[in-house]
Amino acid sequence: METVLRVGVAGPVGSGKTALVDALCKALRDRYRLAVVTNDIYTQEDAQFLVRSQALPPERILGVETGGCPHTAIREDASLNLAAIQQLETAFRPLDLIFVESGGDNLAATFSPELVDLTIYVIDVAAGDKIPRKGGPGITKSDLLVINKIDLAPYVGADLEVMKRDTLKMRGDRPYVMTNLKTGLGLDQVIAFLTVHLAA
């Protein structure tokens, strides 16, 4: 039985989760067999964005409408997501990697360990340089923290050095990456992180 790496992508609304999944799919799709599950409360907006962007063939992208708190669908009752993963694994066996993008949530959001193997947590500079020191499991326990939209720092009065310092303080030796997903800056580091785990 082949093992599919399941990678959860979480973070607040507007932080860049879908942009990250889109960029990763486009960068990895020629080397790995991929699929995506997205979570939205009442729509399939993120799934539709990925289809329009041609991140992957549309049949490899499944949108889950959670109908309530996005946290519940990835933690307390992950059944909708587990069913979507099973559907993709059955239809496209063998797969190497499935991204599970959570709905936008707060800093306390975490994935159920039965749902994903790795978690990437995305925050953005526009929310202010205080975000890393606010903590929460996404900041402190995710396998990779992505600090996105670093190009906006001067416009929102955020100090990237403060963010780096606070991130190191909150995460210890857990990795983090500073990105500007609009230009692709830092994306290679996220890809390198995933490639190590895909090779394991």
From Swiss-Prot:
Its main location: cytoplasm. It is found in: Cytoplasm. Keywords: Chaperone, Cytoplasm, GTP-binding, Nickel insertion, Nucleotide-binding. InterPro entries: CobW/HypB/UreG_nucleotide-bd, P-loop_NTPase, UreG. One of its GO terms (biological process) is urea catabolic process. GO terms for molecular function: GTP binding; GTPase activity; nickel cation binding. One of its GO terms (cellular component) is cytoplasm. Homodimer. UreD, UreF and UreG form a complex that acts as a GTP-hydrolysis-dependent molecular chaperone, activating the urease apoprotein by helping to assemble the nickel containing metallocenter of UreC. The UreE protein probably delivers the nickel. PANTHER family: UREASE ACCESSORY PROTEIN G. Facilitates the functional incorporation of the urease nickel metallocenter. This process requires GTP hydrolysis, probably effectuated by UreG. HAMAP family: UreG. Belongs to the SIMIBI class G3E GTPase family. UreG subfamily. This is Urease accessory protein UreG.
